[in-house]
Amino acid sequence: MSTLQVDIVSAEEQLYAGQASMVIAPAAEGDVGIAPRHAPLLTRLRPGELRITPEGDEEEFFFYASGGLLEVQPHKVTVLADTAVRARDIDEAAALEAKRRAEEKLREQKDEVDYSSVQAELAEAMAQLRTLESLRKRAKR
């Protein structure tokens, strides 16, 4: 079976380095699935879930990335994330609170509110919560 070398790196640390049979990433224009021998690609990441399927029957790994770059070569995938965490390390209470605060700011509609940054905050919180939900669904199987 053919595999890819996958590296997930943030400014703080390297979160993952290993072989995988599939990577699913939140590219700017939509999710992309990357298998071995994929065509070269360089794209921005939007906030969302990264899913790594290791070779063999091992369980998938889930990560959250706040954005960054995805570089794909035929046998290598590199994620350079602005911020990234393992899904199991996401603070659900903090994500829910960030979501609540962003929604409140959007409802207030004050002149000094920077709507694009508030929408970005809301998108990040929602992406973290979706990543946690995916992890929980996989755990139930």
UniProtKB/Swiss-Prot annotation:
Keywords: ATP synthesis, Cell inner membrane, Cell membrane, CF(1), Hydrogen ion transport, Ion transport, Membrane, Transport. Pfam families: ATP-synt_DE, ATP-synt_DE_N. CDD domains: F1-ATPase_delta (cd12152). InterPro entries: ATP_F1_dsu/esu_C_sf, ATP_synth_F1_dsu/esu, ATP_synth_F1_dsu/esu_N, ATP_synth_F1_esu_C, ATPsynth_dsu/esu_N. It is a peripheral membrane protein. The keyword Lipoprotein does not apply. One of its GO terms (cellular component) is plasma membrane. Disulfide bonds: none annotated. Gene3D superfamilies: ATP synthase delta/epsilon subunit, C-terminal domain, F0F1 ATP synthase delta/epsilon subunit, N-terminal. It is found in: Cell inner membrane. GO terms for molecular function: ATP binding; proton-transporting ATP synthase activity, rotational mechanism. The keyword Ion transport applies. Belongs to the ATPase epsilon chain family. F-type ATPases have 2 components, CF(1) - the catalytic core - and CF(0) - the membrane proton channel. CF(1) has five subunits: alpha(3), beta(3), gamma(1), delta(1), epsilon(1). CF(0) has three main subunits: a, b and c. Produces ATP from ADP in the presence of a proton gradient across the membrane. This is ATP synthase epsilon chain.
